[in-house]
């Protein structure tokens, strides 16, 4: 089979970076971030979070190849807001939302167990 070993989907090799940033020279105030060892799940979540930000003009992602465990996200922002700032804010907001979701989920499970329904 051509499929890479399973561990390659989540283990970073020695010297491999989780996130690589490069400036987009074709568009002003834009950057391209490559996130290694992740897939559509995180890519779509980050893109959706970025699109909630009014200072983000464009946010899109792609997985270059189905056998490569990485995605590339392109972000363009307004002149007074950097793509890196937008990326960091989106991740921070996403972590807060997921934390709230986890808390509510645990509360719902606890309530269900106590209620006996």
Curated annotation (Swiss-Prot):
It comes from Drosophila melanogaster (Fruit fly). GO terms for biological process: transcription by RNA polymerase II. The lineage of its organism: Eukaryota, Metazoa, Ecdysozoa, Arthropoda, Hexapoda. GO terms for molecular function: DNA binding; DNA-directed RNA polymerase activity; protein dimerization activity. PANTHER family: DNA-DIRECTED RNA POLYMERASE I,II,III, DNA-DIRECTED RNA POLYMERASE II SUBUNIT RPB11. The keyword Transmembrane does not apply. Keywords: DNA-directed RNA polymerase, Nucleus, Transcription. Transmembrane segments: none annotated. Its main location: nucleus. PROSITE patterns: RNA_POL_L_13KD. This is DNA-directed RNA polymerase II subunit RPB11. GO terms for cellular component: RNA polymerase II, core complex. Belongs to the archaeal Rpo11/eukaryotic RPB11/RPC19 RNA polymerase subunit family. Component of the RNA polymerase II (Pol II) complex consisting of 12 subunits. It is found in: Nucleus. DNA-dependent RNA polymerase catalyzes the transcription of DNA into RNA using the four ribonucleoside triphosphates as substrates. Component of RNA polymerase II which synthesizes mRNA precursors and many functional non-coding RNAs. Pol II is the central component of the basal RNA polymerase II transcription machinery. It is composed of mobile elements that move relative to each other. RPB11 is part of the core element with the central large cleft. Pfam families: RNA_pol_L_2.
């Amino acid at each position: 089979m051509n499929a890479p070993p399973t561990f390659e989907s989540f283990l970073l090799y020695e010297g491999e970076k989780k996130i690589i940033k490069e400036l987009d020279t074709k568009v002003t105030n834009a950057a391209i971030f490559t996130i290694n060892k992740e897939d559509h799940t995180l890519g779509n979540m980050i893109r959706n979070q970025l699109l909630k930000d009014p200072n983000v003009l464009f946010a899109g992602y792609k997985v270059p190849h189905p056998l490569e465990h990485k995605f590339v996200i392109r972000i363009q922002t307004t002149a007074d807001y950097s793509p890196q700032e937008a990326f960091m804010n989106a991740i921070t907001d996403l972590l807060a939302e997921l934390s709230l979701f986890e808390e509510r989920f645990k509360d719902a499970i606890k309530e269900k167990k106590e209620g006996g329904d």
